[in-house]
């Protein structure tokens, strides 16, 4: 065999080995740092919470440390921090009164501060009766709705993630985390708590651009409540959409 043929054979063998190694290299790294954004447009009674109509927005970071790696399965410990998180509650700002009978009266009773409510108030007029000076007046009362936003900081140190097909660019995964959230005032209603516990679980897909860079799209069930430590504890159940960009090492 000529020298040229030997060189060509060696080059082909080297390329084949390189491709085989690339195929076998997992898209999984021992440590992963990530940044993410989250949004939930509404809350409702999904499992435990009863505070409806809440919106949640969050920006945060996470750290993953791999615990095991197999051919078709990988697991990692996860911790997340949310230095910026906003919880928007529906409120009642006042009551609009209408009494058409003579002497007619209409006016607005405004509260000194908006009152957060368990459920968004309806704008449908309610029939009411006013008795004064031996006269009875029939009219309507309409609640005036509003919102308030509270900035929250949250930390979830206890989490775990299981990924399928760690050798593939597209990896389905499931996650579960537990932690707490701290706010400057009670959420979601008065007399609840400024310190709440959180837990969440969800599923998504991780898409690798390279062996160390990836994007994640995920949907989670998120619960926030004070576990009965205060007079009020309606709790918030939210369906959260999450987008993450990750750097592996």
Predicted regions and their residues:
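Extracellular loop and loop/strand-boundary signature of outer-membrane beta-barrel proteins
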Residues: 45-51, 142-147, 185-191, 226-233
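Gram-negative (and chloroplast) outer-membrane scaffold detector with strong preference
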Residues: 57-185
């Amino acid at each position: 065999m000529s020298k040229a043929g030997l060189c060509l054979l060696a080059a082909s063998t080297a390329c084949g080995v390189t491709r085989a190694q690339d195929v076998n290299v997992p898209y999984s790294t021992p440590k992963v740092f990530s940044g993410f954004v989250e949004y939930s447009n509404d809350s409702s009674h999904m499992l435990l919470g009863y505070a409806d109509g809440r919106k949640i927005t969050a920006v945060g970071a996470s750290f993953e440390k791999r615990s095991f790696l197999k051919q078709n399965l990988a697991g990692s410990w996860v911790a997340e921090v949310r230095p910026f998180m906003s919880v928007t509650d529906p409120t009642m700002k006042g009551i609009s009164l209408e009494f058409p009978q003579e002497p007619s009266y209409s006016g607005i009773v405004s509260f000194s501060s908006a009152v957060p409510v368990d459920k968004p108030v309806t704008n449908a007029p309610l029939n009411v009766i006013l008795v004064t000076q031996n006269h009875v007046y029939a009219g309507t009362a309409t609640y005036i709705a509003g919102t308030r936003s509270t900035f929250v900081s949250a930390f979830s140190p206890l989490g775990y993630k299981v990924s399928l097909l760690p050798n593939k660019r597209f990896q389905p995964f499931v996650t579960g985390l537990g932690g707490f959230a701290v706010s400057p005032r009670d959420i979601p209603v008065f007399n609840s708590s400024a310190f709440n516990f959180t837990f969440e679980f969800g599923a998504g897909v991780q898409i690798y651009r390279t062996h160390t860079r990836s994007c994640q799209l995920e949907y989670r069930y998120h619960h926030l409540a004070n576990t009965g430590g205060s007079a009020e504890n309606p709790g918030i159940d939210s369906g959260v959409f999450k987008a993450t960009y990750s750097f592996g090492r």
